[in-house]
Amino acid sequence: YKGQTPVVCVGPYVLRNSFTDTELQVATRSAFERQTRLSTEGDEQYEKRVKNGVSINNLDRFSYFFSRAYVIILSTFLALFIIVPFLAPILYKTGHKTSANIIYKVYHVICHQLAFRSFYLFGEQPYYPRELANINGVITYEQVVGSSSIDLEYARAFIGNNMIGYKVAICERDVAIYGSLALFGFIFQLTKKKIKQLPWYLWFIIALVPIAIDGFSQIPGLSSNWPAWVPIRESTPVLRIITGTLFGVGTGWYMYPMMEESMKETRVTLHRKFAIVNKLNQTKKLVDHETSL
């Protein structure tokens, strides 16, 4: 209750801080009148709420558990989500091509998997960018495939070989996004969820704008059917990692504290319910014991 005590809850009515005996009597009488009216009307939803309010079910237990462990659950899921794409080239290298292809196909749903925008394992280089990226001292994608034209469908399906290595199942930017989002989640948990929410306008400036500029400015470079005045560019692996990390960290910084506010309300509500139900059960046991004497 954020220090606003004492607090008295009488049915749907809540009295905070200093309140008079009259206010308490009015709230109690109103709650009883409301209970009588709803019971007389035979409101089924009310009866269900009353029954649910004096019992603890599995959904309550799961909701309470999830409200406490949601950061670890989501961050662990994201960590596994980012690890699996790296298993694809490992499996391909070790001869388990069927398993590797399943991973490639599953992640194809969420990622373009363009060969010139992906990382590689077990090859001469960790990436093979397009010539348009103007990165000196690296083998380009065009040199690998032996063609100066870009076939997008072929680039998506291209996995690699023993010489250049095998492609990770998601692109460079997605690796940075999901990896940094998972990392921020673990950091948020280690700080006991005390990191304050990033304002939406800072999220927009820090997280969204850079990735939008870097990503959308590459679109003309995928086709030759653009006017001459349209700038043609290709981003670099470093820029993709930077903008992806900014988006992942910024989104986690904005999202997790906001989720914590909602989860905190859930924990308080359920903790109060558990306390009430336990008190009712103790009272019932005491009454039953005294009755049996």
Predicted features and spans:
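Interfacial helix-loop-helix junctions of multi-pass membrane proteins
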Residues: 163-167, 214-247
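Hydrophobic alpha-helical transmembrane segments
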Residues: 169-188
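Extracytosolic (periplasmic/ER-lumenal) interhelical loops and adjacent juxtamembrane/interface segments
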Residues: 93-170
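N-terminal signal-anchor transmembrane alpha helix
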Residues: 68-98
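Non-catalytic, surface beta->alpha helical segment in thiol-disulfide oxidoreductase systems
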Residues: 9-40
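Cytosolic juxtamembrane amphipathic/interface segments immediately preceding
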Residues: 52-67
